[in-house]
UniProtKB/Swiss-Prot annotation:
Its main location: cytoplasm. GO terms for molecular function: 1-(5-phosphoribosyl)-5-[(5-phosphoribosylamino)methylideneamino]imidazole-4-carboxamide isomerase activity. The gene is hisA. This is 1-(5-phosphoribosyl)-5-[(5-phosphoribosylamino)methylideneamino] imidazole-4-carboxamide isomerase. It is an enzyme of class 5 (isomerase). One of its GO terms (cellular component) is cytoplasm.
Length: 235
């Protein structure tokens, strides 16, 4: 199992949101690359980056910060937010991003996502509220079940599914292990839990489950409720 510490970018700064609400943003750093470097020092192999402005605009909006992160650390970069076409995918890969997350487009155009997954390192982001898929930066909840969307990408060549329970995101209230497991079982794709990590017990619970391939850690690191160095030791 991997732990993927997260950097959410808004207006060039590292922030965290509560339940995906942009006006809830709390700034943690004016220099996100320094945060990424800290993750590397603590033992991480990955950094999970979300371009929040990009997610709402539908196009890249924090390129300079992403470039700085790439230039200043050796972490593998997983990036999502506002990736809607092949040109953007190619641009980010040329920049040195290792894996790209397709979210809203996976609901609206799954054929496109499957095509991209056959050519590039792609993860599918499934963000859900009460089991239903949310799109467009979580501003809109669809009528599709998250497990049905996961099933759509079984055997499609995607590297991973990143599964976020929006109701828990940024709330430090514990990971929704059952929901994450349901996505993993529906898709048979490596599934990464996101949303709600509070402390080391969440890491232990996800690892013990056996069907969860990774956990994204955000606010728990920034607020100091999870010792990342300790977390890496139990993997």
């Amino acid at each position: 199992m991997d732990i993927l510490p997260a950097i959410d970018l808004k207006d060039g700064k590292a922030v965290r949101l509560s339940k995906g609400l942009m006006d809830s943003a709390k700034i943690y750093s004016d220099e996100p690359w320094q945060v990424a470097l800290r993750f590397e020092e603590l033992g991480s192999k990955w950094v999970h980056i979300v371009d929040l402005n990009g997610a709402f605009a539908g196009k890249p909006a924090n390129l300079e910060q992403i470039k700085k992160i790439r230039e200043n650390c050796n972490l593998k970069i997983e990036l999502g937010g506002g990736i809607r076409d092949e040109e953007t995918i190619k641009m980010y890969l040329e920049l040195g991003v290792d894996r790209l997350i397709l979210g809203s487009i996976a609901v609206k155009d799954p054929i496109f996502v499957k095509k991209m997954a056959s050519k590039y390192p792609i993860a599918v982001g499934i963000d859900a509220m009460n089991g239903m898929v949310a799109v467009e930066g979580w501003a809109e909840v669809s009528t599709m079940k998250a497990t049905d969307l996961a099933r759509e990408f079984a055997n499609a060549g995607v590297q991973a599914i990143i599964c976020t329970d929006i109701s828990k995101d940024g709330m430090l209230c514990g990971v929704n292990v059952e929901f994450t497991e349901s996505i993993a079982l529906a898709s048979s794709v490596d599934t990464i839990a996101s949303g709600g990590v509070k402390d080391i017990q969440d890491i232990i619970n996800c690892k013990a489950n056996g069907n969860i391939s990774g956990v994204i850690v955000g606010k728990a690191f920034y607020e100091g409720t999870l010792d990342l160095e300790e977390a890496f030791k139990i993997l």
